[in-house]
A protein has these predicted regions:
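PLP-dependent aminotransferase class I/II
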Residues: 1-119
Length: 119
């Protein structure tokens, strides 16, 4: 999937053998589509997605009271990278028993979405 424009994809580290439970996808800010648009399209094609519970946790509803009172946390820096992760990143589910056909379906579905968005 390295040739797919508009996405940031994970790569295993040298000398590693990861056991993927999900495949993380980040949509670049200049991709021409949003995380939600891609995620909704994949869901419509029976590919399950989940937003990543990470990024700027202070913007999650669980922190509403802390934000209102300004107590119980501290912020270092502008958190720009964490905002990007919060707004642009999601998972597609994978597991060791997936067949090559299943993987190719996911890849081709993502490529079709991006090709359609370029028109």
């Amino acid at each position: 999937m390295k040739d797919i424009e508009g996405l940031i994809l994970p790569e295993p580290q040298k000398n590693s053998n990861p056991s993927w439970f999900g495949f993380l996808i980040s949509v670049k800010e200049d991709a021409g589509f949003t995380r939600n648009e891609l995620s909704e399209y994949l869901e419509s094609k029976k590919i399950q997605t989940r937003n990543l519970f990470a990024g700027n946790l202070l913007k999650h509803p669980a922190f509403n009271e802390m934000r209102q009172t300004g107590e119980g946390y501290r912020v270092v820096g502008d958190l720009k990278g964490t905002d990007f992760i919060l707004n642009n990143t999601f998972w597609i589910g994978v597991y060791p028993g997936m067949t090559e056909e299943m993987l190719q379906y996911m890849i081709s579905t993502i490529k079709k979405f991006i090709a359609f968005r370029k028109v």
